[in-house]
Structure formats: structure tokens, C-alpha cells
Amino acid sequence: MVAILTANGYECVEAICPFNLLKRAGLDVRFVGLNGKTESGSCGVTVECAMTAAELIESGEKIDMLVLPGGLPGATNLDEAPETDKLIEITEKCGGFFAAICAAPMVYGKRGMLKGKTATAYPEFRKYLDGATIAEGNVARDGRFITAAGMGAAFDFGLELIRALKDDETADKISAAVCAK
């Protein structure tokens, strides 16, 4: 299961665009609310979450990928929540992927998870990518870590998530189907 962890103040495009692309790829993707079953984005869009973070933690369900959207104060809310640490721990035990965009890569960076990796984030938040090599482009994938610079990279970020969980062919077909190429 792909868990897109939303917190109040998340960046709408960074959560919804990858969700849409992952659904098109036939993946089991769900919004997981940090604080409740509904979370409000910084742009005013509220998502209905399949479950709360606490419910996912209690379920024992396998997490194939944990996706953290950026936006403020959403990314800060994720960074400060103990539930985020527990979901990181579960994802690690499952051998899953860790993905984050915009300000949210700081969550992994501040926990030392990006040391020795190539990663990116919104320019003002790159200082939190402790020990990482900053990528040249807007999307970086290094092993089980996928990061992106911001809202403008949300589509390419979503395609990279598909490449990680499925393959290049599936990502390319979806890109063509939505008239991106």
C-alpha cells in the first residue's frame, strides 16, 4: 500500500497529483490523515482520508511507500508528529520506499536518513538534508528514496513513484495517456 500522509496545511498539488497518477497505475494508494479523516490543504482543498495515521499504525498493514507532501505548515506538522516516526519505522521494516516533495524531504533529512544519498527539496529547505548530495534536477531517486523540489515537479515526482513501484513502461504509458508527452 502507498500511504500519502497528509497533515493540515499540506500542498494540494503535491498530494493530489501523485495520488492520481498512482491510481492510474493500478496501485493501492490512500490518503492517510495525520490528525483525522479529513485534512485541509494550504490552498483550501480538503481531502477525505481512508484512515488516520493512528489507524494505519494499529492495523499492521504493509507500507510499500510512504509519501510526504510539502506545503506549510503541513511539512512542519509531519516533522513534529510522533506518528510520522512510527510510520517511518513501519515502512523501513517493510523494506518500502520513502518519498517526499518540497519542504517535506526535511523530515527524512533531519532524521539522518538521507546521509550519503542524492536528494532535493525546496531550496529554502535543502539545509535540512544533512549529509545528502543535492541533486541537479527537480526529482531525485537514490535507492529507496525519492525526493522532489516543489509543486512544479509534482507530475514528474508522481511518475518516478510509479517507476519505483512498477516500471518505466507503465510510467511512460500514463504520461502519454494524460497528454504529457
Regions found by a protein language model. Give the residues of each.
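Extended, subdomain-level signal for the structured scaffold at the beginning of enzyme domains
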Residues: 1-97, 107-116, 126-136, 141-181
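Anionic-ligand binding patches
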Residues: 119
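Catalytic cores of processing enzymes, dominated by hydrolases/peptidases
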Residues: 122
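Short, thiol/selenol-centered motifs that function as redox-active sites or metal-ligating centers
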Residues: 101-102
